[in-house]
Amino acid sequence: MKTQFAILLITLVLFQMFSQSDAILGKIWEGIKSIFGKRGLNDLSDLDELFDGEISEADVDFLREIM
């Protein structure tokens, strides 16, 4: 009886580990697909506008209004 209970517990632990690792690997794969997919690469090019070093006249006016 003790052996059967131990085997059951070990089986449950291994099954839980497998199901959690499957979910983690699935999320990692989704992230990789979103980064290297066509839409993902196009979306990354939009981030270049965020790091533009130039300040436009509208930005300067907005900063003056805030101050």
From Swiss-Prot:
Subcellular location: Secreted; Target cell membrane
Propeptide: 40-67
GO cellular component: extracellular region; membrane; other organism cell membrane
Keywords: Amidation, Antibiotic, Antimicrobial, Antiviral protein, Cleavage on pair of basic residues, Membrane, Secreted, Signal, Target cell membrane, Target membrane
Transmembrane parts of this sequence: none
GO biological process terms, semicolon-separated: defense response to bacterium; regulation of defense response to virus
Keyword Signal attached: yes
Signal peptide: 1-23
Tissue and organ distribution: Expressed by the venom gland.
List of residues that carry Phenylalanine amide: F36
Described function: Amphipathic peptide with antibacterial activities. Shows antiviral activities against the herpes simplex virus type-1. It potently inhibits the initial infection by provoking the rupture of viral envelop and the dissociation of proteins from the virions (EC(50) is 0.43 uM). It also effectively inhibits viral attachment (EC(50) is 2.87 uM), viral entry (EC(50) is 4.29 uM) and viral proliferation after infection (EC(50) is 7.86). Morever, it enters mammalian tested cells (Vero) and reduces the intracellular infectivity.
Assigned protein family: Belongs to the non-disulfide-bridged peptide (NDBP) superfamily. Short antimicrobial peptide (group 4) family.
Protein name: Peptide Hp1036
Organism whose genome encodes this protein: Heterometrus petersii (Asian forest scorpion)
